Amino acid sequence: MMMAIHTLRREQALDADVDAVFALFADPLNLEAITPPLLRFAVVTPAPIAMGVGTLIQYRLRLHSVPMRWDTLIQAWEPPRRFVDVQVRGPYRLWHHTHELTPLDDGRTLMRDTVRYDLGFGALGALAHRAIVRRDLEAIFTYRAERVPALLS
């Protein structure tokens, strides 16, 4: 069965230098502050978490009231410009999230997120994507875009 790979892209200019933005995302505990409260997101891996290629981070969350575990593996780690996390256990068949940071001439940073994901489940997964998942992901990343600037100030 072919995978139906979807892509979510977001860009945001942030009023902070690239080192400050990377430092924010280099600490997985900050994910709790930029994830909507409805998801009841919590990092399970004990702090401090030494980030780098091969780091495994475990989370707990609720999707539509369903409790689940999500394990993320850091696949690429290139401070302060880029890192990639992939889901190794969780609700998606594929979750590949590339974070890219580009310094701008005015001292700000352009943050780019590219998420490639697949739900699996064939036609049922396609229906769930159209009805629920795409909208949920857009809302999660919109919330994040609203929260990140406050954490950098």
Language-model region placement:
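Short, surface-exposed coil-to-beta transition loops
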Residues: 7-9, 67-71, 94-98
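Generic structural detector for well-ordered beta-strands
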Residues: 11-15, 42, 60, 73, ...
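Generic C-terminal helix-cap and adjacent flexible tail
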Residues: 4, 150-153
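Hydrophobic ligand-binding cavity/cleft-lining segments
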Residues: 1-52
